[in-house]
Amino acid sequence: MHQLLENLSGNGMGLLIPLGLSWLIWTILLPKQQYRGKLFNDRARFEWFYTKARRRFLENGGVILNNAFKKSENSFYVMTSREVEIVLNPKYMNEVRNDDRFAVTERVDQLLHGDVPGFGIIKHSAQTHKIFSNTFQSRVVREIGTFLVPIFEEIDHFLETQWTDNEEWHAFSLHPSMVQLVSQESTRLFLGPEMCRDAHWLQASVKYIQSFFMGIDLLDSWRPIFRPLVSKFSKTGKQIRSDLAEARQILSPFIADRQARKAKGEKFNDLLQWFDDAARGAEYDAPLLILRSSMAAVHSTSDLLTKAIFEICTQPGLIDDIREEAIRVFKEHGLRQTAIQELRLTDSVLKETQRLKPLQTTAFIRLTKEDVVLSDGLEIPKGTPIRISNHHMWDPEVSEYPNADQFDGYRFYKLRQVPGQEQTAQLATVSPSHTGFGLGKHACPGRFFAATATKVILCKILLDYDLKLLDGQRPKTMWRGDAQVPDPMCQIVVRRRKEEFNLSSLLHDVK
């Protein structure tokens, strides 16, 4: 409740009484209407409301889920930062993943408040959603190899200007830097060379992403009927709409100019053009699809890169091996897609990072559209939000991976040498044992682009820089619900090194 008081501006104070009453109903009565069974993280003794239970999950969700599975093997109800959900054991993945009785789109719309003004970048018409998914699943996969040089140019430019050529040790916070880097290199693919170094656009898009997630935390405590009002009169809600309007103001004239140039016969080759190709003349909201693409790329790729760099900073031998692989592969293949496919150790390090510290510790976010009885008799009532745990990837008691709770950067490199594992052990490949990118028909459509970009970025950084953790301090574990997020304040120390092989020299060979 105090969060809303801090957010409400003067003209919203008149809503305080009705919103306060709704909050009381939501925190006391509604949870008992949402589930059948025992709530694992119920209110503590002398707690009248569920506010603190929600807050505890927001701040320590991964630990709560881990403790719950120690006491309830198959499933349990949990109060998340938003509402009561049922969390299922990973053994149900194959049964649930393609079952249309479990709605994906509707649940994602709920979680991201797609009906609230300012949050609609995820909620699209069926036609627009098809444009988005088909473009990433087919066109991006087909074209990504032709974009290696432009993407590399942006990585090179960012590191030269932001990390600099300073040969003395200097420190900075890693995660914000990775957010900026991924934003610049992904914009080269999304909007072409005119926008990828536009400081106004890069700042606006990242600012919107950050305010978007702040807004989710604010709205999660309120019933859906009141969320538009909370958003309308809160400082956070106003900031989200302002940031969205700013992003549109930048993109709209750019897109209009693009259309005028196309009418004169000029050709373009980037994500915006591919969306147009997939639309085949149908109307769609291009700025929203670009923002959605940017959010997906920046949020997930910067998370994976940050966690991977934190891990390998403590393993100089692994860093040396990655450098040796990069030199050998790029000397032989140049900046081509065949080189990316041969970066097997780099791929392994990233896949291992995602296995041990995925973006979220649960997957398969769904909403039951009808009463469901699973094969072992487990009953899930209609309208129940569900999610499936990913703990089979890192819990040594249930995982198929040896020493599953330990980081082994060579794990998947070695697995790819086992007959039958050549394909399944790759970063972009999904399987029941590794669900970092999901599983089934709803697996992340942008994972091939993410895998390519992260490998190029990691190799370029390690070839050009020495790096270590500041004072040798490993980053502390931070939770946002079930997501283990990088510590935004954790710093690394870097210095420019005299690389054994200059990747930038390959630009001339390709051109």
Curated annotation (Swiss-Prot):
Glycans are attached at residues 7, 502. It is a single-pass membrane protein. Its cofactor is heme. It is found in: Membrane. The chain crosses the membrane at residues 10-30. It holds the Pfam family p450. Keywords: Glycoprotein, Heme, Iron, Membrane, Metal-binding, Monooxygenase, Oxidoreductase, Transmembrane, Transmembrane helix. GO terms for cellular component: membrane. SUPFAM superfamilies: Cytochrome P450 (SSF48264). GO terms for molecular function: heme binding; iron ion binding; monooxygenase activity; oxidoreductase activity, acting on paired donors, with incorporation or reduction of molecular oxygen. One of its GO terms (biological process) is mycotoxin biosynthetic process. It is an enzyme of class 1 (oxidoreductase). Its EC number is 1.-.-.-. Heme binds at residue 444. PANTHER family: CYTOCHROME P450, CYTOCHROME P450 MONOOXYGENASE AUSG-RELATED. Cytochrome P450 monooxygenase; part of the gene cluster that mediates the biosynthesis of paraherquonin, a meroterpenoid with a unique, highly congested hexacyclic molecular architecture. The first step of the pathway is the synthesis of 3,5-dimethylorsellinic acid (DMOA) by the polyketide synthase prhL. Belongs to the cytochrome P450 family. This is Cytochrome P450 monooxygenase prhD. It comes from Penicillium brasilianum.
